[in-house]
C-alpha cells in the first residue's frame, strides 16, 4: 500500500516535471552587432591669411577645404581597414612669408598627412620647401606664380592655372578688345603681384604696345595718390595692377577721383566682388582675370552645399581648395594609406572630376589644361565674359552651353499592344469582289 502511494506520488511529480520541461522554449536572441571598426585619425592642414586685408579670401579658401573634410567624414571612408576620421588643422599665415614658414613647420610637427594651401604665392613658395623636405604633399588652390612648381620639388601641386597663362590671357584680351597704345603697370612688390605684372608686360610688349616704366607699392599701400598723379600726367590708355583687392580697390577709387579715365585691369587677387565695396561706383567697367573657371561655373552640388553650410556664396578659389582636399583624400583611398610615401604616387597620376572640373597633373605638379576667365564689373557684381583655354577665347555663355550635359534622348513611344486574333468561329467571311469591281 505504501509502495503504491509512493509510486503514484513519484509518477505525479515526474508528470509535473515533464509538463514544465516540455513548455515553450525561449526565443533565440538576435546576434550581437559587430563592434565598429577601429578608427584612424588623419590630419590635413590648411593655411591662408585669416587676419588682415585679405582675410575674406583666406576664409573662403578654408571653407572649401572644410566642406570637403565634412563630406568625407559623412561618407564613412575606410582606410587600412579602419574608419577614417579626417581632421582639418587650419592655420593663419597672415599672408606673411615668415609667418608662413613658421606655420608650415608647425604642421610638419603636427604630423599632418597633407596640406592644402597656402593662398598667396609669396607664402606658398617658401613653405613648399619645408613640406617637400618633410615628404608631405601640398596642393595650393590659389598660388599662381610659376616658381611654385618650377622649383622641381617633390609633392608640390596646384589646382589653378599659372601666371604665365593668366598674364597673357588678360593682356591679350585687353589688346584685342580695348586696343591700348600706352599702358601703365603697377605692382605690390610681392611674388604674386610682381610675377603677374611681369607676364602682362611681356605680352603687351610682344603685341607692340608701349609700356611705361613700372610703378611700385606694397601689399599694405592704401594711399596711391603719388603714384596715380605721376600716371595721370602720362595719360595711359590702360593701367594694370598686380596685387590684391585690399589694395587694388583703394587704387581704383583714388584714380577716378583724380579723373584718370584709363581702363583698369587686374589679376585674380583683385578679381572679387569686394572691389565694389572698396572702390564704389569706380569699380564698374574694370577688367580682371581668374586662373580657372569662375565660381558661378563650379559644380552645382558644390555651390548648393557651400551655400547651405556657410550661408554665403563662394568668393574666389574655394572650389579649388575643395578639390585640393578631395584630391588628397582620393589618393589616400586609392593607396589605402594616409602615408605620403604610399599615396603620393596615386596623387601624381590621379584623374578626378571635382567642383572646378576635370583635374590631372603634369610632371611639374601643374594642372593640365587650366582655363582662364575674364570678368568685368557690372552693376556692382563681377560678371564673367570670356573663357580662355589653349589660346582660344570663347564667350562665357557659349562655354556654359558647351559644358551642359546633353539632354537624354526621348524614350521611344511604347508599341501598341498587338490586336488579339479573332477566333475562327467569329471571323467574318469576306465577300468575293464583284466582277465590275475587279475590272477597275
Where are these regions (language model features)?
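Extracytosolic ligand-binding ectodomains
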Residues: 2-5, 9-14, 22-440
Amino acid at each position: 500500500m505504501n509502495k503504491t502511494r509512493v509510486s503514484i506520488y513519484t509518477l505525479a511529480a515526474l508528470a509535473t516535471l515533464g509538463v514544465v520541461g516540455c513548455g515553450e522554449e525561449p526565443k533565440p536572441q538576435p546576434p550581437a552587432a559587430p563592434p565598429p571598426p577601429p578608427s584612424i585619425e588623419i590630419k590635413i592642414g590648411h593655411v591662408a591669411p585669416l587676419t588682415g586685408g585679405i582675410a575674406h579670401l583666406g576664409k573662403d579658401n578654408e571653407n572649401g577645404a572644410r566642406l570637403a573634410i565634412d563630406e568625407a567624414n559623412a561618407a564613412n571612408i575606410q582606410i587600412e581597414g579602419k574608419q577614417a576620421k579626417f581632421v582639418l588643422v587650419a592655420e593663419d599665415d597672415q599672408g606673411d612669408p615668415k609667418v608662413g614658414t613658421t606655420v608650415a613647420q608647425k604642421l610638419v610637427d603636427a604630423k599632418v598627412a597633407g596640406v592644402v594651401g597656402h593662398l598667396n604665392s609669396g607664402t606658398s613658395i617658401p613653405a613648399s620647401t619645408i613640406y617637400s623636405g618633410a615628404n608631405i604633399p601640398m596642393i595650393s588652390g590659389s598660388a599662381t606664380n610659376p616658381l611654385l612648381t618650377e622649383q622641381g620639388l617633390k609633392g608640390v601641386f596646384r589646382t589653378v592655372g599659372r601666371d604665365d597663362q593668366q598674364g597673357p590671357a588678360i593682356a591679350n584680351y585687353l589688346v584685342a578688345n580695348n586696343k591700348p597704345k600706352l599702358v601703365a603697370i603697377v605692382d605690390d612688390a610681392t611674388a604674386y603681384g610682381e610675377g603677374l605684372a611681369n607676364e602682362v608686360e611681356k605680352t603687351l610688349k610682344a603685341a607692340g604696345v608701349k609700356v611705361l616704366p613700372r610703378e611700385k607699392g606694397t601689399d599694405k599701400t592704401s594711399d596711391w595718390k603719388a603714384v596715380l598723379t605721376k600716371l595721370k600726367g602720362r595719360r595711359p590708355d590702360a593701367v594694370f595692377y598686380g596685387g590684391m583687392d585690399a589694395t587694388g580697390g583703394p587704387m581704383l577709387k583714388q584714380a577716378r577721383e583724380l579723373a584718370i579715365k584709363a581702363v583698369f585691369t587686374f589679376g585674380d587677387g583683385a578679381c572679387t566682388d569686394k572691389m565694389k565695396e572698396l572702390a564704389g561706383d569706380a569699380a564698374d567697367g574694370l577688367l580682371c582675370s581668374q586662373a580657372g573657371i569662375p565660381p558661378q561655373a563650379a559644380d552645382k552640388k558644390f555651390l548648393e552645399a557651400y551655400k547651405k553650410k556657410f550661408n554665403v556664396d563662394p568668393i574666389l578659389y574655394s572650389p579649388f581648395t575643395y578639390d585640393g582636399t578631395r584630391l588628397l583624400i582620393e589618393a589616400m583611398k586609392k593607396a589605402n594609406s594616409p602615408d605620403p610615401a604610399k599615396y603620393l604616387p596615386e596623387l601624381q597620376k590621379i584623374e578626378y572630376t571635382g567642383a572646378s572640373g576635370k583635374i590631372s597633373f603634369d610632371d611639374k605638379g601643374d594642372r593640365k589644361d587650366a582655363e582662364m576667365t575674364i570678368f568685368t564689373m557690372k552693376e556692382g557684381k563681377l560678371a564673367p565674359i570670356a573663357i580662355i583655354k589653349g589660346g582660344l577665347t570663347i564667350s562665357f555663355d557659349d562655354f556654359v552651353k558647351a559644358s551642359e550635359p546633353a539632354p537624354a534622348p526621348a524614350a521611344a513611344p511604347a508599341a501598341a499592344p498587338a490586336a488579339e486574333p479573332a477566333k475562327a468561329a467569329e471571323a467574318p467571311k469576306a465577300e468575293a469582289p464583284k466582277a465590275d469591281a475587279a475590272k477597275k
